[in-house]
Amino acid sequence: MSAIFLTGTDTDIGKTVITTLLVHFFQKRNIPIFSFKPIQTGAIQRNGEWYAPDPVVYEKVTKPTSHNEFYGILLKKASSPHLAARLEGVQIPLQEIKEQIAFLETKYEHLILEGAGGLYVPITDEGYCMIDFMQELSYPVILVARAGLGTINHTVLSIEALKKRNISIAGIIFNQLNVDDHEIEEDNRIMVKKLTDVPVIGSVPYMDNLIERLKEEEVRDQLISNWDEKRLKGVLLNDAGSAIK
């Protein structure tokens, strides 16, 4: 069994889209993989039942035994996990979530875990953060960053935080969240690589109605067409040297 942890430089950076595309990327190469969201906030209600919004997107490429197999805990408020849990009067059962991940490791050959928010989003009121959870799991990390203006600072700071914890970094995927200045975006990729020495393993171009269009295989193929196949396969299949610290 092997796994990748996917995180982002911020919330609403496109982690769920990238997670879904990563599943498609590996499925196209006959590598089975299952996506899992350990902590989901911002539940949505349908026909009187609560659903996890990110796994609803996963279902465009994966059919689980049941919807709730995709996540560890579902909290209603769209906020950082510590606040959402406090408002519901519950504690996030970290040990149970880790046990659920351990079970999934026995059920599926490969996993991709999607974090909530960025590295330092609090999970508990005591200050236990997503980066602490990631460090305990010890999976190599893919960092999702926006492509446009301002991303250099956010991305470099996130990479430095991961390196300080000795967390293995598989690479960076840039996500174009809107139509931006191409010259800035290209320079961002060059400068981030220069400042961090972490490879850019892919980028996702801007597309209207992207989440809805993920159900189209042709669109998914188009979005992953420039991804670094050798590196991604190496990271997932535990090829030494494919991830850096």
Label each PLM-derived region with a short phrase.
Residues 124-147:
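Inter-motif core of Ras-like GTPase G domains
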Residues 160-245:
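C-terminal lobe/tail of nucleotide-utilizing enzymes
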Residues 97, 101-128:
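Switch II (G3) loop of P-loop NTPases
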